[in-house]
Amino acid sequence: MPAAISRNWPAPAKLNLFLHINGRRADGYHELQTLFQFIDCCDMLDFKVTETPELILHSNMSGVVADSDNLILRAAKSLQQTTGFNGGAEIWLDKRLPMGGGLGGGSSDAATTLVALNKLWHTQLSTEELAKIGLKLGADIPVFIHGFAAFAEGVGERLQAVNPSEPWYLVIAPDAHVSTADVFQDPLLPRDTPKLAIDTLMSQPWANDCQKLVVSKYPQVAKALGWLLEYAPSRMTGTGACVFGEFTQQQQALAALAKLPSEMQGFVAQGMNLSPLITRLSHP
């Protein structure tokens, strides 16, 4: 009897509510202090366990194999190799999040793959063990596996659960692809923000150390951020290109969205301190 398809596994987007760069390590990675929060806008994945070890991915992206697709298959393969599981999976990705942009969609897809297949394959790895696999694939993946809003240090892997407010956001996705590698290699990127205690960071105005550099190089990001600042406190997430404005009420965010210039793409979402992936994990 063929296995049933396990449906509707969410892979939520994240925002970096602040992002500080504290230095550069000998291995080239950067020391960071950042605050991750999820938003209720997600890619969705379905999974079917197979008896043979093949990993097959289907996507709604018109046959385009994107980085997130590759990361999904790499995550599944890593779980197979770590656990010795000799079956496989067929995976369907419904891609709804903007590609790249600093929302973490590819990392989130990989995290959901690890969490879902660990359950469906009955491989019984702990959250920490899954996070170790995820960290080898991408620095942002552990926060999606743990599934709670978090203050992160190191390269982003040392996580401390936090409970910031859950406002409404208007997220704008400029028509620009910002290379994370290029941003972190740029000599003009500030790398000397002092490390601060979490209590201090949570109570002071929030900023993104990558924003000034990206805005100077990408006029589309500068234009989107400039427009958004007319309506709400706003900044960039990750290394961009997405920017977000913060609103206390949904109606305020929707009212601003209604005025969005036609050449810009945006959406309204609410902050979430608990990932919908964790909620889904408790269901069959």
Swiss-Prot record:
Q: Is the Kinase keyword given for this protein?
A: yes
A Gene Ontology molecular-function term?
4-(cytidine 5'-diphospho)-2-C-methyl-D-erythritol kinase activity
Q: Is Kinase one of the keywords? A: yes
Q: Name one Pfam family in it.
A: GHMP_kinases_C
Q: Which Gene3D superfamilies match?
A: 3.30.230.10, GHMP kinase, C-terminal domain
Query: Which domain of life does the UniProt lineage start with?
Result: Bacteria
Positions annotated to bind ATP: 98-108
Q: Which reaction does it catalyse?
A: 4-CDP-2-C-methyl-D-erythritol + ATP = 4-CDP-2-C-methyl-D-erythritol 2-phosphate + ADP + H(+)
Broad enzyme group: transferase
Look up the record and name the pathway of this protein.
Isoprenoid biosynthesis; isopentenyl diphosphate biosynthesis via DXP pathway; isopentenyl diphosphate from 1-deoxy-D-xylulose 5-phosphate: step 3/6
Instruction: Enumerate the InterPro entries for this protein.
Output: GHMP_kinase_C_dom, GHMP_kinase_C_sf, GHMP_kinase_N_dom, IspE, Ribosomal_Su5_D2-typ_SF, Ribsml_uS5_D2-typ_fold_subgr
Q: Which GO terms describe its biological process?
A: isopentenyl diphosphate biosynthetic process, methylerythritol 4-phosphate pathway; terpenoid biosynthetic process
EC numbers on record: 2.7.1.148
This protein's UniProt keywords: ATP-binding, Isoprene biosynthesis, Kinase, Nucleotide-binding, Transferase
Active site location: 14, 140
User: What is the documented function of this protein?
Assistant: Catalyzes the phosphorylation of the position 2 hydroxy group of 4-diphosphocytidyl-2C-methyl-D-erythritol.
Family stated for the protein in its record: Belongs to the GHMP kinase family. IspE subfamily.
Q: What protein is this chain from? A: 4-diphosphocytidyl-2-C-methyl-D-erythritol kinase
Q: What organism is recorded for this protein?
A: Shewanella baltica (strain OS223)
